[in-house]
Design a protein with these regions (language model features):
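NAD(P)+-binding Rossmann beta1-loop-alpha1 motif at the extreme N-terminus of oxidoreductases
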Residues: 3-52
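Rossmann-like NAD(P)-binding element
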Residues: 56-99
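Rossmann-like NAD(P)(H) cofactor-binding subdomain of soluble oxidoreductases
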Residues: 85-147
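Predominantly flavin-linked oxidoreductase catalytic cores and closely associated redox partners
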Residues: 125, 129-183
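Active-site-lining helix/loop region of Rossmann-like oxidoreductase modules
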Residues: 158-254
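NAD(P)-dependent Rossmann-like dehydrogenase/reductase catalytic/cofactor-binding core
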Residues: 212, 230-314
């Protein structure tokens, strides 16, 4: 039976995976394409079957797939935004006119998106919104086709922070029974401890030649890990640790520990994760999203703190 209506914004891999997984658990999910269109181009497709594969399996019936934000956001105060961080302002403006007072907006994978959403919501007069970021994406996933999503992992509890941070408890409570969320101290903690700041950047740049010359689909977590990437990850992590220490924030462990497990043929815990396809070029979001939005902000913060980060700067 349907328990609560949840609006999921964004129809990429994360949007489809989140919508399918929630639907399998009995929630009424409206999945909304975040590309603005003219009113006459709006559509609503009801009871859409979405196949979920990989670490989570099942065929879900998503209540509706649409590009009409008014319909998607009707009669709900629970919103999960799953668009690329480069589109945060566009997405915030897309949903703002249709939000109910007191709506809770969870941004996956965060990346300081709550700052932008908060500013837009203030500008457009949204009443009492609760908006916050997850620390890393809700799922590592891909959209494989029109109605097929691949999950590299199941759900594990996520740290979250709202902006302003005094709303973090309200955000956790709003999604109680939907996701287990753990309060973080600030958006800086969730942003800098997200794995993409380090893993995507280090793995992709070192493997640029292999990615661009690949004749077959490339799997970076299966093919891209070697001694050099492990050393680079540890070096970048040491720089990150200095910045986190200067901020007085906890620092997540170096990803090299998990990367070593990915490279170990006797370890099968991460087999689905290693089957996440891509990237296929140097214009993938691993570069175009994670470097300008995460990497550059991290460098600015390090500079403001007087912490040297030569590897990140390079």
């Amino acid at each position: 039976y349907f328990m609560k209506k949840i609006a999921v914004i964004g129809t990429g891999g994360t949007g489809y995976t989140v919508a399918a997984e929630l639907s399998l658990r009995g929630f009424e999910v409206w999945l909304c394409d975040a590309t603005p269109v003219e009113a006459e181009a709006a559509y609503i497709e009801q009871n859409v079957e979405v196949k979920l594969t990989g670490a989570m399996e099942g065929t879900a019936t998503v209540r509706a797939v649409t590009n009409d934000p008014k319909a998607a956001l009707a009669d709900t105060q629970l919103v999960i935004c799953c668009t690329i961080s480069n589109l945060d302002e566009q997405t915030a403006r897309f949903i703002a006119p249709h939000l109910y007072p007191g709506s809770a907006v969870l941004i996956s994978a965060g990346n300081l998106g709550a700052l932008i959403y908060h500013r837009v919501f203030q500008e457009l007069g949204v009443k009492d919104p609760i908006v916050g970021d997850t620390c890393g994406n809700l799922f590592s996933c891909r959209r494989l086709g029109d109605r097929v999503a691949f999950a590299g992992n199941g759900y594990s509890p996520k740290k979250v922070a709202a902006f302003p941070v005094r709303d973090t408890g309200k955000l956790v409570k709003a999604f109680e029974g939907i996701y287990e969320l753990i309060p973080a101290s600030s958006l800086l903690e969730t942003t800098f401890n997200a794995p993409n700041l380090l893993s995507h950047i280090s793995l992709t740049i070192v493997n640029a030649g292999a990615i661009e010359n690949a004749k077959e689909p490339y799997y970076i977590f299966k093919q891209g890990i070697c001694r050099s990437t492990l050393n680079l990850a540890d070096g970048m992590w040491a720089e990150k640790k200095k910045v986190m220490d200067a901020l007085g924030l906890p620092c997540a462990p170096s990803p090299s520990g998990n990367h070593r497990k990915y490279a170990d043929p006797t370890v099968h815990q991460f087999d689905h994760f290693k089957n996440l396809i891509g990237p296929d070029s140097m214009s993938s979001r691993y570069i175009t999203e994670d470097i300008p939005i995460l990497g550059c902000f991290f460098l600015s913060m390090a500079k403001a703190l007087g912490v040297e980060t030569p590897l990140y700067a390079a």
